[in-house]
Amino acid sequence: MNKFLKATTAFIIAIAITAIMIVTANAESRYIEKNFTFDGIAPTVIIHHPVYDWVLTAKGNKLTWQKPNGSASQMFVMFPSEYDGYYRIREFNNGGYEQRYIGYTPSGFKLVWQEDVQAPAIAFKLVWKAKDTVSGKSVKNVWRMPCKMNNKYFCVGGWGCVRIEQTNA
C-alpha cells in the first residue's frame, strides 16, 4: 500500500507540474511582438477602424498616420541635426503644425506591438534609441498610444478605437 501511495503521489505531482508548464507556455505564447525599423523600406500597416480604415506609412524620415481621404493625419518626422548627428523626432498634426518634440534617435523609428491572439487586445508604441545627455549611456525611449478601451481595441488620441494589422512585411 505504501508503494502504491508513493506511486500515486508521484503521478499526481507529475500531472500538476505538466499542467503548470502547459499553462505557462500558453500564457507566454498568447502575445506576439513584431518590430519594424523605419528606414525608408518600411511596411504599410492598415489600421482597421470600426467605420473606416486608417493607414500607417513610413517613407524616408517620415512616419504618418492618415485617413484614406486625406482629411486628417498625424506625422512623426526625424530631422537630422548638424550638431551631433542625431535625428530630432517631432510630431505634426494634419494642418502641418508642430505639436510637440518627442525625442531623438541615432537611427530610426521602431514600431512595436503585442497582440493577444486569444482576445486580440493590442498594445501599440513607438520605440527609438537615444543617449542620455548627462550619463552618456544609451537609453530607449517609448511613445505609447494613450488608452486601452476594451479587449479588442486601443484608443489613438481622439480618433476612436482601432485595430492594427501587419500587411506586407
Regions found by a protein language model. Name each.
Residues 22-28:
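Sec/Tat signal peptide C-region and signal peptidase I cleavage site
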Residues 1-12:
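Bacterial N-terminal signal peptides that target proteins for export
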Residues 11-20:
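Bacterial N-terminal signal peptides
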Residues 28-169:
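Lectin-like carbohydrate-binding module/patch detector with strong preference for beta-trefoil
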